[in-house]
């Protein structure tokens, strides 16, 4: 999937045609279902940027990217050779705690690229822009700073974003890397999370018995087993 111009995408007045246009611009393999509030928030963001900078049309973002297998999604990512800007879009009121949790998690995933990361959230219903500080605090942000971050010198990444983020980069072995495991510096794939939920439900329902799962080598079976053990310990 390629980056696109949100300025170009938000010029279209009909949401019925947005999905088709987005696919043409990004080269996405499958059509993306864009909800009305998402489109509205993106249009509001573009309008705000136009008030503070001249060349909004030149900004390139990866829109609604989801890391394969992990199911982790980002609303807007500007990726350059020397820094990353992440902007999350919200339409309704959301707590600073929830915003902070999401942006910190996003930063962890993005850190594999080993570049400085600037993290923002825009709440369109309040016309509120916030950012995550280097000390992991949520503070109100000004548009001038966001525009400055977006216009920093650097070369836009023009390749497919899937080539930068692979699930195996986030899978660790609790046996060979116990410190990272104990610090929970890992994330399970969506399939692993589903398996864990089912097994824990069965354990609580039946209280005894044998529970198992299988998979080919390299799919994170050991990590899942250890995570289930930790989760069960915490819940009992």
Enumerate the language-model features and the residues they cover.
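Accessory nucleic-acid engagement/destabilization modules that flank
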Residues: 1-167
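Conserved adenine-nucleotide phosphate-binding loops and their immediately adjacent elements
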Residues: 166-189
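N-terminal pre-P-loop "Q-motif" helix
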Residues: 184-203
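Hydrophobic anchor at the beta1->P-loop junction of P-loop NTPases
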Residues: 213
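Walker A (P-loop) phosphate-binding loop of P-loop NTPases
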Residues: 218
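Conserved lysine of the Walker
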Residues: 221
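Hydrophobic positions on the alpha1 helix immediately C-terminal to the Walker A/P-loop
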Residues: 224
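Conserved small/polar residues in nucleotide/adenosyl-binding loops
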Residues: 233-236
